[in-house]
Amino acid sequence: EAATSGIDIFRIFDALNDVSQMRPAIEAVLETNTTVAEVAMAYSGNLMDPNEDLYTLDYYLRLAEQIVDAGAHVLAIKDMAGLMRPAAAAKLVSALRERFDLPVHVHTHDTAGGQLATYLAAANAGADVVDVASAPLAGTTSQPSMSALVAAFANTERDTGISLQAVSDMEPYWEAVRQVYAPFESGIPGPTGRVYKHEIPGGQLSNLRTQANALGLGDRFELIEDYYAAVNEILGRPTKVTPSSKVVGDLALHLVGAGVDPKDFAENPRKYDIPESVIGFLQGELGTPPGGWPLLRDAALADRSPVDHTVEVPAELEGDLASDDHDVRRVALDKLLFPKQYAEFQEHRRTYGVTDQLSDRTFFYGLVEGEETMIWYGEIDEQRPPLSVRLDAIGEPDEKGMRQVILTVNGQVRPMLVRDEHAESTVAEAEKADASNPGHVAAPFAGVVNITAKVGDEVKAGDQVATIEAMKMEAGISATQDGTIERLAFSQPTKVEGGDLVVVISEK
């Protein structure tokens, strides 16, 4: 379907470098006879370190041999955290070019600030392609600067043939775009060598900071980085690419939020709640990590039933997947590959309309008084024109944090009440758990809590009494002692802050 839609090059990778899991995708690309299978090795560790015993040159060469045997057209090195030093790039690329007659494509992130040197070393060793970003969007968690690379190779044997002036002329546009997306910045003001310790992928580093802020942990980010490094070791140093990087990040955030030392968790994981993504990883949901299973696996999975990770195509989608209608096939693929996200997307459209027609600035920041925009409801239809909406005035918040907003919709004045999430409310705050009371079960961090226990239930310490979901992370909340559920802090799924009371357990 993607090839039919115009995709020419498919970068295929597995989060744990398992070629057997990449083969179906490689074979599907080969069957098109028109597209390119670029198969990537996720890079981790430091192959120049004499103490490196997992991600060695021999490891990557054996992996590359499996990739070539599977039918790859292009070999890619996917250095998601920017860990590959120049000497390592030269050594690895040289070895790949000596053994395999395939183009080599190098991808990295510039978190530490030295990856232009890595690209120069890779190119001189025979790399054919590298990934860059326009200068205003380059550096730190992004890729090295395109302008810098073009200038570095100008008038040399590896001259790119790209006009530096043409590249520079595009930069003001991307500077303006970056300002619109400023709230999603990583928060890293410049390069950081800490990446060589924590190994957080560039694509995850900004998301992790956003997650930390949402969980109320934003001021403890350096501790989160330290815990990420510790969790990486605990889980056996897996290659960290989506979704394996999420597993490490989820556990690091969870331990920081719950105030649990990584060493204590590693010694007795059954004492603590474990995020669902971590349980799935330990159950083999993502495959087998390159270094084998970590020591805590058996203890963490004790009393949990084995899970069959085979996914069957729902019968109701089989016909749609074989449909001649392009749109029907696409919807079926969305439902099959991303069922939760598809449902959320449809709910968003039912609630807010077709928001992808709004300008980025309007979508992220809203209208200013006197500003007008067009809004679509339902699918875009030439027979049903959009609504013209102008923001006229915004009132002061009331005691519940509600503001009256005056709009003009298609020429008619429409007042409405809107909750201001940033306004202070005089409504009583949620009850806090008493840390000195072992019967008080608290939310470990900010999120939406759903209490699964009922008043009167007999529970043992460690039994799950609720679940919490926040920023794509799900985890259980367990009883803190043996006893009876005496009181629930709320009856419906509720947004809470870290430390809010969830349930009260009376001791037997």
Regions from the PLM with identified roles:
Residues E1-P103, L120-A127:
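Alpha/beta enzyme core
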Residues M80-V260, N268:
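Catalytic alpha/beta core domains of metabolic enzymes, predominantly
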